[in-house]
Amino acid sequence: MSWQQRVDDALTARRATDTLRRRYVVSQGAGRWLVANGRQYLNFSSNDYLGLSQHPQIIRAWQQAATRFGVGSGGSGHISGYSVAHRALEEELAQWLGYPRALLFISGFAANQAVITALMKKNDRIVADRLSHASLLEAANLSPAQLRRFIHNDTQHLSRLLQSPCVGQQLVVTEGVYSMDGDSAPLAEIQHIARRHHAWLLVDDAHGIGVTGDEGRGTCWQRGVKPELLVVTFGKGFGVSGAAVLCSESVADYLLQFARHLVYSTSMPPAQAQALSASLAVIRSDEGRERREKLAALVQRFRAGVNASRFTLLNAHSAIQPLIVGDNSRALRLAEALRQQGCWATAIRPPTVPVGTARLRLTLTQAHEACDIDRLLEVLHGAGE
């Protein structure tokens, strides 16, 4: 088989099963409205849960820092790319979340890959929830450690897997809020089981940080859990981009030596770090609390209004509200029907989600109004099959 045939066959297979992904060019993709091809849509696909990507205080912080530092960091943090803005943000994050150290990464994907590849050795075992993010599972598959996956949120299965003999160390991997199902992990029980088996716990709280818990401290804080490794990302609740790993002093020092994604990547721009500090200040303020309360009310309004006889709504109380459709082509048709009625929603299909669970991944944000939720429900019930 030639290179070209390999490429063509893979694309043909995706087209045949209605799983071919595509990108859409938008003029505005975050916030209440999405603008594409000159048309405005109510936006139910954005991860900008608190509406902070458009916050004037955060935009101004980025602009002012860009004037001071320039638009790039100029290098890896190990060379010349670790500025006072980066250090200040790391210290603020560590203090906020109650950890000795925080390390910044350019993305959540990079942070997850870096931690797993740096820590895991040949005789180790990773025990991950089977619905963990692709960045976690890919890193686990590529690492020399053994990967075992437990049934989603099934702590008994997790316990059985941890009980089997392991010569090396064990790492339990889960998420705070799951990106495709919108539900939360039973973190307290997972941590208890991990500690009983002398395993470390890694929690990716990309979709919980900023949005849940006291001062937006996330799912772990809300559940009274402190994992050895906490990954938080800044492209959702923070409204910006990037990520951080919260950990102990010694683990931070270890990652600075052995996390290749950190050592060999250009640091995020200092202006971005400054904007993230401004975003954190909003999240921790009374305004941040009010934004979280508004979002929670919108989620409750949506869930109360969905016709359960026509749609399968998962047990999710986060900003992520998936409607399970099942069939790939039906999910695509439903997404298109919503767009025709002015609501932008995304059909999620395998391999992102398991076969037979194609869905509309609806995301609600603080930028929405109650009338937007009512319009979404009206369109959904009119388009349902």
From Swiss-Prot:
Family annotation (InterPro entries): Aminotrans_II_pyridoxalP_BS (IPR001917), Aminotransferase_I/II_large (IPR004839), AON_synthase_class-II (IPR050087), AONS_Archaea/Proteobacteria (IPR004723), AONS_Proteobacteria (IPR022834), PyrdxlP-dep_Trfase (IPR015424), PyrdxlP-dep_Trfase_major (IPR015421), PyrdxlP-dep_Trfase_small (IPR015422)
The keyword Transferase is assigned to this record: yes
UniProt-listed Enzyme Commission number(s): 2.3.1.47
Binding site for substrate: R21, H133, T352
Tagged with keyword Transmembrane: no
SUPFAM superfamilies named among the record's database cross-references: PLP-dependent transferases
Modification N6-(pyridoxal phosphate)lysine occurs at: K236
Enzyme class: transferase
Keywords associated with the record: Biotin biosynthesis, Pyridoxal phosphate, Transferase
Recorded catalytic activity of this chain's protein: 6-carboxyhexanoyl-[ACP] + L-alanine + H(+) = (8S)-8-amino-7-oxononanoate + holo-[ACP] + CO2
Entry similarity comment: Belongs to the class-II pyridoxal-phosphate-dependent aminotransferase family. BioF subfamily.
Assembly mode: Homodimer.
Stored HAMAP family: BioF_aminotrans_2
Protein name: 8-amino-7-oxononanoate synthase
Species of origin: Salmonella choleraesuis (strain SC-B67)
Gene name of the encoded protein: bioF
